[in-house]
Every structure is written in structure tokens, then in C-alpha cells.
Amino acid sequence: MIDKRRSRERMVREQLTARGITDPAVLAAMRKIPRHLFVQEALQAQAYEDHPLPIGYGQTISQPFIVALMSQILRVTPGMRVLEIGTGSGYQAAVLAEMGAEVYTVERIAGLQAHARGLLRRLGYARIRTKLDDGTMGWPLAAPFDRIIVTAGGPGIPEPLAEQLADPGTMAIPVGASRREQELYLMHKNDGALSYENYGKVAFVDLVGNHGW
């Protein structure tokens, strides 16, 4: 049986701070949240290792560093409204909630959405709003959002998400012509103008939907 608290401390020290994650809110959240509960029981011993893990339905939970990186570059502050596309296991949503965000998260796979919603509630994150839908369409009735985080890679930035981003606002999204490899972009909206930062190569599961693959 793994020592979960020590495993989290080691994860934060060796995978996050050693690789440039400095945001105190991100580090505190990932030090606190029991990541092993967000993976299948047979894989819990690997939950704090530096790689993604399958969570069923052909989907994965991202490696800890990628979760931390995306959370950090978004510069989330308490009270911000954050839309997550791709609930998956629910882990990223929990991190954002621990950072003080008002989280809305959309998942297209019913089994994952139901499991994540139940787990988040059991862990005390009942205020996270979850929805079963095509994530590339966003959540129009709850828009606009100060931040949007997309945890799947598509061929471009879905127009509905760009429209639902507040001004000013920031979106983190993997984009690439290949389904196997993308680049992580941070898109900023300011006074109607869009600008982009590139954070390098990443590999995410497919962003599936009307405005994805």
C-alpha cells in the first residue's frame, strides 16, 4: 500500500517545483487532493507518477505536471468563473476548485461524467457544476467565462469557446493538425483582439465534437 501523503509530497517536489511550477495555489491544491481516488483501483499505485493513466472509455487522466502547468499559466484567482472542456476523471476540476474558482465542466461521455460528478461530491466539491454535452459547444447559458481550459486536443480553437471567453479572458488549449501530437496554446482576449503564447508540444486525447475532430 502506498503512503499517499508522502507520494503527493514527492510528486510536488520532484515533478512540479523541480520543473518550474511556482504558483502557491497550484502546489497547495495538488499537495492536498487525493489523486489516487481519481484513477482505477488497479492503477492507484501509479497515481503519483509522472505519466498519464487510462480512466476508461479510451480517455486518460493527464500527468501531474501537465495539470499543474495548465493551471499555473491560466493565472486563476479566487472567484473567477472557469469552464473546463473534458471533465474526464474530475481531477483537473478539483484542482481549479481548490484554487478558488467557480468551476463549470463539460464531458461528452456519460459514464465518465456520472463517475466524476459522484466522486467530486463525495470529496466535498459539490459546488462544481457538471454537464453532459458536446464540449466544443461550451456552456452558452453560463457564459461568459474568465478562463477556459480544454483538456483534449483538436484541429483548432472551437469558435463557440472563443465567443464564450470573457474580455479580458484567457484560454488554455492543445491544438494540432495531428491527433497524436499538439502544441499547448494560451489564448488571450483583450479589447476584442486575440493573442497567443505557445507552451510547446503536448499529447492529449482527441477533442471530439461539432467543432473538434
UniProtKB/Swiss-Prot annotation:
<comment type="similarity">
    <text>Belongs to the methyltransferase superfamily. L-isoaspartyl/D-aspartyl protein methyltransferase family.</text>
</comment>
<protein>
    <recommendedName>
        <fullName>Protein-L-isoaspartate O-methyltransferase</fullName>
        <ecNumber>2.1.1.77</ecNumber>
    </recommendedName>
</protein>
<comment type="function">
    <text>Catalyzes the methyl esterification of L-isoaspartyl residues in peptides and proteins that result from spontaneous decomposition of normal L-aspartyl and L-asparaginyl residues. It plays a role in the repair and/or degradation of damaged proteins.</text>
</comment>
<feature type="active site">
    <location>
        <position position="62"/>
    </location>
</feature>
<keyword id="KW-0963">Cytoplasm</keyword>
<dbReference type="InterPro" id="IPR029063">
    <property type="entry name" value="SAM-dependent_MTases_sf"/>
</dbReference>
<keyword id="KW-0949">S-adenosyl-L-methionine</keyword>
<dbReference type="GO" id="GO:0004719">
    <property type="term" value="F:protein-L-isoaspartate (D-aspartate) O-methyltransferase activity"/>
</dbReference>
<dbReference type="Pfam" id="PF01135">
    <property type="entry name" value="PCMT"/>
</dbReference>
<keyword id="KW-0489">Methyltransferase</keyword>
<keyword id="KW-0808">Transferase</keyword>
<dbReference type="InterPro" id="IPR000682">
    <property type="entry name" value="PCMT"/>
</dbReference>
<dbReference type="GO" id="GO:0005737">
    <property type="term" value="C:cytoplasm"/>
</dbReference>
<dbReference type="GO" id="GO:0032259">
    <property type="term" value="P:methylation"/>
</dbReference>
<dbReference type="GO" id="GO:0036211">
    <property type="term" value="P:protein modification process"/>
</dbReference>
<dbReference type="GO" id="GO:0030091">
    <property type="term" value="P:protein repair"/>
</dbReference>
